[in-house]
Amino acid sequence: MAGRILLGLTLLATSLPLLAMGDAAVVPCISYSTVPGYFLQDDPAVDPKTFDYAKEGFGLIDQAYDTDETLDAELKKLPWRRFEHKVRSLNKHAASNVRFAVLFLGRHGQGFHNVAEAYYGTKAWDDYWSKLDGDGTITWSDAHLTEEGISQAKVARDTWAGQMKNSIPLPEVYYTSPLDRCLATAKFTFSKLELPPSKPFIPTVKELLRETLGVHTCDRRSSRNYIESTYPTYKIEPGFTQKDMLWDPEVRESDSDRDARLKKLLDDIFSHDKSTFMSLTAHGGAIRSILNVIGHREFGLQTGAVIPVLIRIETSTDAPEDPEEDLTIKIQGLN
């Protein structure tokens, strides 16, 4: 079964582009770093346990930028417009292999698995209950949102609506985990917002954006047919299988393997998507890995919370890989 995880990740990894150079292939190498100083969550003095993203308007720091002088006087009054102008200026003046992007990372609202873990305790949950589909009272296989979870997603919706009045730059693209709690959170957060026709809410379901793989049934996704019928307006990425090929009932993904998987996800996104402002609806563990990959300080999110991050993306190329040379080396190694 563990081989299925490796096979699935390998197949997904092959979707990343290779740049042809004669008979050799150049493998794009993408590195990420956080650009700090724009959001309160960047500050080590800010406590994630008490921080209220909704009250803080997603945490944008109201400050002057060196690009303000090129804005109209009225737009200078709007912190989000000044921030957007700054980000677009960074991209305008960046090297050809460098770009900047803003990720709005949203954790799903409370799911039934969260309720069960709180009720039974983490040890009993990890040792026993998480391996079952439910306890006879509630079901947590591919856990759905509770009423509280739906309310949390609507808080995120209201926060977006409030900041839209302050000219927040809207996501140009939406991505979501294929697990139901994220699919539903994205729907309750964005589907009722008055978005412009140029930036509609049509999320793309990304297999690699899901929570830690294996063992816990709450992290086993439903079939492709279920997702397509329940969320008919969502797009599903190419290669998305009917059945869950990544979940293993015997093997739980390590934190380092999860980091590597989320790095592949970011590589896939930034190899194909030129958007600057992006929304990703995901999980506590997945977001923890993304923050680790981009070099952000650790910042745990409560269910339903959102953290924005400004990141720098740099693409370089490794030395060309020559299949014939590689084969020669292997043959020589047999002598």
Swiss-Prot record:
Its EC number is 5.4.-.-. This is Probable phosphoglycerate mutase ARB_03491. Probable phosphomutase that may have a function related to the manipulation of phosphate groups on carbohydrates. The record marks H283 as: Transition state stabilizer. The lineage of its organism: Eukaryota, Fungi, Dikarya, Ascomycota, Pezizomycotina. CDD domains: HP_PGM_like (cd07067). The keyword Secreted applies. It comes from Arthroderma benhamiae (strain ATCC MYA-4681 / CBS 112371). Belongs to the phosphoglycerate mutase family. It comes from the Eukaryota. It is found in: Secreted. Disulfide bonds: none annotated. SMART domains: PGAM. PROSITE patterns: PG_MUTASE (PS00175). Coiled coil: none annotated. One of its GO terms (cellular component) is cytoplasm. GO terms for molecular function: isomerase activity; phosphatase activity. The active site is at H108, E211. Residues 1-24 form the signal peptide. Keywords: Isomerase, Secreted, Signal. Its main location: secreted. It holds the Pfam family His_Phos_1.
